[in-house]
Amino acid sequence: MASYYSNDFRPGLKIMFEGEPYAVESSEFVKPGKGQAFARVKMRRLLTGGRVEKTFKSTDSLEGADVNDLNLTYLYNDGEFWHFMNNETYEQLQADAKAIGDNAKWLIDQAECIVTLWNGQPISVTPPNFIELEIVDTDPGLKGDTAGTGGKPATLSTGAVVKVPLFVQVGEVIKVDTRSGEYVSRVK
């Protein structure tokens, strides 16, 4: 695998740090008037999702991580594993609850997901940015009830709870941003 100096760090680069894969989120190269240049780097730990800030000298180098992102289709959950399929090879892959994390509530059948593999094992699953889900439970919106923030909680078909406008009713299909967990619009 390639080796990268700290001044080569760019957002999206995947590197090995302390024996684990990390993704660089931001990197600022600083060249002070006196002293050695350094890079201030914000990284996300791919195994747990935790964020780390670290300062590297300009002479420091790290190995690139052997991490692959695959576009796979979500098939089903058997209670223990979530199953995905590669649409080109029809090869199936299973991910455990640790790899899925909080994204389980955004997985719907036939959704195109990005599965990140490290050493051939799934370490994270990213659902599509926007999905359409049906509302299965919410309070009725009363006419003229606009006091407060103008939102109410709604339970979706996957079990996720999002805040929706007062006019949205049970049985309607809405579009949700999976990155923030927020209501986007009604689907016609």
Curated annotation (Swiss-Prot):
May be beta-lysylated on the epsilon-amino group of Lys-34 by the combined action of EpmA and EpmB, and then hydroxylated on the C5 position of the same residue by EpmC (if this protein is present). Lysylation is critical for the stimulatory effect of EF-P on peptide-bond formation. The lysylation moiety may extend toward the peptidyltransferase center and stabilize the terminal 3-CCA end of the tRNA. Hydroxylation of the C5 position on Lys-34 may allow additional potential stabilizing hydrogen-bond interactions with the P-tRNA. The keyword Protein biosynthesis applies. The modification N6-(3,6-diaminohexanoyl)-5-hydroxylysine is found at K34. One of its GO terms (molecular function) is translation elongation factor activity. InterPro entries: Elong-fact-P_C, NA-bd_OB-fold, Rib_uL2_dom2, Transl_elong_fac_P/YeiP, Transl_elong_KOW-like, Transl_elong_P/YeiP_cen, Transl_elong_P/YeiP_CS, Transl_elongation_fac_P. Keywords: Cytoplasm, Elongation factor, Hydroxylation, Protein biosynthesis. The keyword ATP-binding does not apply. Involved in peptide bond synthesis. Alleviates ribosome stalling that occurs when 3 or more consecutive Pro residues or the sequence PPG is present in a protein, possibly by augmenting the peptidyl transferase activity of the ribosome. Modification of Lys-34 is required for alleviation. Belongs to the elongation factor P family. This is Elongation factor P. The gene is efp.
